[in-house]
Amino acid sequence: GVDLVSLGGTKIGALAAEAVIVTDISSSRGKALAEALSYLRKTSMQLASKMRFVSAQLNALFQDGAAVALANASHANSMATRLYQGISELAQMHPHISIPNRAEANAVFPILPAEITERLQQSYRFYLWNQATGQVRLMCSFDTSEQDVDGLLSKLEGLLRG
């Protein structure tokens, strides 16, 4: 089974909230994990003095059966799928790029030539995931629009054409 779940709140609409969820705090293992995480949070400077205000964002997103959180996450994932499909189509026409992994959540990891990455970064904010291979990390979130995705794909296609 799963002991921990990590939740990135910024991808679903929170300003600055992340969560680690212990799935079974009734077990001795779950209790030990929860205790260790509480201590780790303090020692790694992740305990804000007014944490309840940060946490309130997650509480709001997960009210009413988590409808808002699920809708926002689903949207982010669908935008990543759109981005993945577009880059996959470009990769079929341009041997200089590839996309080795499917988009399974809200992230896409294509491999681009360094000069394309540098020029694309002049218009879009993302970073190099693996310098040795040229793999970049492109993230979609609750507020990524179809126009955002299509704009990046259009820019990338233009750069590939030269």
Which residues does each PLM region occupy?
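Active-site C-terminal subdomain of aminotransferase-like
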Residues: 1-92, 98-107
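Conserved C-terminal alpha-helix-loop-beta "cap" of PLP-dependent enzymes
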Residues: 81, 87-161
